Amino acid sequence: MRNRFLSLSILALLALTGCGAGDPAIAVDGSEGPLVIYPDYKDVTIPANIAPLNFRYAMPDVRKAKTTFTLGDKSVTIRGDEVEWRLGAWKKFLEGAEGQSITVTAKAVVEGKPLTDQWSIQVSEDPVDGWLTYRLIEPSYQMYHEVSILERCVENFDETAICDWQHTDNACMNCHVHGQSRGDYSLYYIRGPQGGSILNQNGKLRKLSLKTDGMLSATVYGELHPDGRFGVFSTNVILPSFHAEAVARMEVFDSASDLTVADFENNRMINVPHVARADAWETFPCFSADGRAVFYCVADTVSLPDGLMEAKYDLVRADFDPETGIIGEQVDTVWSGRTHNASVCHPKASPDGRWLMFTVSDYGTFPLFHPECTLYLADLQSGEIRPMDEIKGNKSDSYHSWSSNSRWFVFASKRGDGQYGKPYFCHLDSDGRTTKPFVLPQKSARFYLYNLKSFNVPDLGNASTGMTVRDARRMFEAESEIFQ
């Protein structure tokens, strides 16, 4: 059988290949219509507390552009091919706009031809959580240095570093997650010899060593329990590989993985022997909204790397005892990857307990470069599960998180160029209907044209974490609390 994958040592010779540069004035994933804009904010639904939707006309030789926004008896006109609002003017314009529609009328001369376009922007009655954390990282194979975890206020353009490479001796860091979308309850990792799990509980920071001698590795993926005492995690032996053919570029897969529970009150790890099967891989656990169940992904082991495309992860559920931290022995299948010839990762329960969102790709658990990767939505009341095809991009849609009101979610997507992940927001109503996703607004209309880093693991919070890089340095230099 022909080996589908190349080793890292061989691929080092291929790292110098590049891609041709196209016309920077033309957006790969710009809007439709007579006048192409990027980012595409045509016919989207937004929360009233979002930052200004700044955009540019992504066409060559744009002249005499005039864009008029109308909301009731209010009207604002911006001239030029880059439409950038002053923050105060945008906020004033949106005062009392909840439940109403903005009409945008655009006129411009493009390559000597006068064009007119019109679209609407619906303002939702539901606000979105005001803070978004993400890791900024090069979309490459070996670049883990010069990494940072940032917190952005989505109501304006303020961005603060929570942790960065300059304050951690160029250590790798990853996976900042909020517990129940709370700003004062979160966790992230600093990797390496001086690393640890940085737990934020009500503003108090702790550096934890979530690893015992009997575990495969330190904790990798996981989530914090709503009550604050426990966390559920996977321990993974992770290997990278590369496709010899132009299919999905990079792969990351587990050669071994188990589940474990961390007791933050008693500094102990709780093994789950009845779940940690020798003939299966378990990963990506999360809690139900009430904290009484754990959802996770599990697959039968296969021979690696040749058998990776046969790794089909199921989505399963088990009870969780919030008094003891014990995961129940009965495991029920929520969605079978094997039956659907597909694979599940990244399950996330909505805070109101109604929905469970997860990611589906053809195989494995690293869908970042899988263009087929799609978000699925499970209604935990009715049992209905469906692919969210209506919001699917032309490239992978992967990691996602919920706003605390369960009416908005954000997800990472490589739609467009296929290289750089960006955070997209989407509204979900009480019946599970979605609206057209829109990308995180930026102060400069040309930001995404020149940005060369991926937004990785976008996670919403209802308040600021309050953490800074000085805190990261202090934690980096601190001794880790040992877990038994």
Predicted feature descriptions by range:
Residues 19-484:
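Sequence signature of WD/YWTD-type beta-propeller architectures
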Residues 7-17:
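Bacterial N-terminal signal peptides
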Residues 1-5:
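Positively charged n-region of N-terminal signal peptides that target proteins for export
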